[in-house]
Amino acid sequence: MSAEEKNIVRVFRAWKTAHQLVHDRGYGVSQAELDLTLDQFKAMHCGMGRNLDRTTLSFYAKPSNDSNKGTIYIEFAKEPSVGIKEMRTFVHTLGDHNHKTGILIYANSMTPSAAKIIATVTGQFTIETFQESDLIVNITHHELVPKHILLSPDEKKELLDRYKLRETQLPRIQLADPVARYLGLKRGEVVKIVRRSETSGRYNSYRICA
């Protein structure tokens, strides 16, 4: 397998995980996109010379139910390393198309200066970044990772009221936790974690993002 072929397979896996991530966050993704094969991916995103065209990998999705979430836009950076210029272009794309959330996926690295731009647009929209290697395997599909379900604000309130808890009494899940990043958790949000049990079938626990 050539170096370019290996790169195509790598990006294909990250592209698939990105679609699964968007779907799992509650945005509309077609079953055809989720089931796309490598050959179909090549036909769509590789030119006549069979080289990957990264400009065709971007996509956006609308929320399935909660319209207040706005649209989410995913872009695969054209350059291996993301600098100020590419990050600014990404920010402008989000603004021009009124996307509320943007995810920029890069191959190698992102400069500190590019990362600083993200903080300057907080409040306008949410920007997340992933390295391709983070998405080659969908961590939530691993058999040892229990199912995480984001609670709505009403469900969170009901949980706290039912058990007479304060937020500070809940166990924490860190923002940097791989599953928290996959789900796009924000501080103060609560996830229900469903684990299997040999005795009771399954049991639930809860964690708050901190």
UniProtKB/Swiss-Prot annotation:
GO cellular component labels: cytosol; nucleus; RNA polymerase I complex; RNA polymerase II, core complex; RNA polymerase II, holoenzyme; RNA polymerase III complex
Family: Belongs to the archaeal Rpo5/eukaryotic RPB5 RNA polymerase subunit family.
Localization per Swiss-Prot or TrEMBL: Nucleus
The keyword Nucleus appears for this protein: yes
Subunit structure: Component of the RNA polymerase I (Pol I), RNA polymerase II (Pol II) and RNA polymerase III (Pol III) complexes consisting of at least 14, 12 and 17 subunits, respectively.
Superkingdom assignment: Eukaryota
Organism listed in the record: Schizosaccharomyces pombe (strain 972 / ATCC 24843) (Fission yeast)
PROSITE patterns in UniProt: RNA_POL_H_23KD
A Pfam family: RNA_pol_Rpb5_C
Phosphoserine sites (modified residues): S152
Species lineage: Eukaryota, Fungi, Dikarya, Ascomycota, Taphrinomycotina
Example GO biological process: transcription by RNA polymerase III
The protein's name: DNA-directed RNA polymerases I, II, and III subunit RPABC1
Keywords: DNA-directed RNA polymerase, Nucleus, Phosphoprotein, Transcription
Function as written in the Swiss-Prot or TrEMBL entry: DNA-dependent RNA polymerase catalyzes the transcription of DNA into RNA using the four ribonucleoside triphosphates as substrates. Common component of RNA polymerases I, II and III which synthesize ribosomal RNA precursors, mRNA precursors and many functional non-coding RNAs, and small RNAs, such as 5S rRNA and tRNAs, respectively. Pol II is the central component of the basal RNA polymerase II transcription machinery. Pols are composed of mobile elements that move relative to each other.
Molecular function in Gene Ontology: DNA binding; DNA-directed RNA polymerase activity
Stored InterPro entries: Arch_Rpo5/euc_Rpb5 (IPR014381), RNA_pol_Rpb5_N (IPR005571), RNA_pol_Rpb5_N_sf (IPR036710), RNA_pol_subH/Rpb5_C (IPR000783), RNA_pol_subH/Rpb5_CS (IPR020608), RPB5-like_sf (IPR035913)
Major subcellular location class: nucleus
Disulphides: none
Keyword NAD tagged: no
Gene, per the UniProt record: rpb5
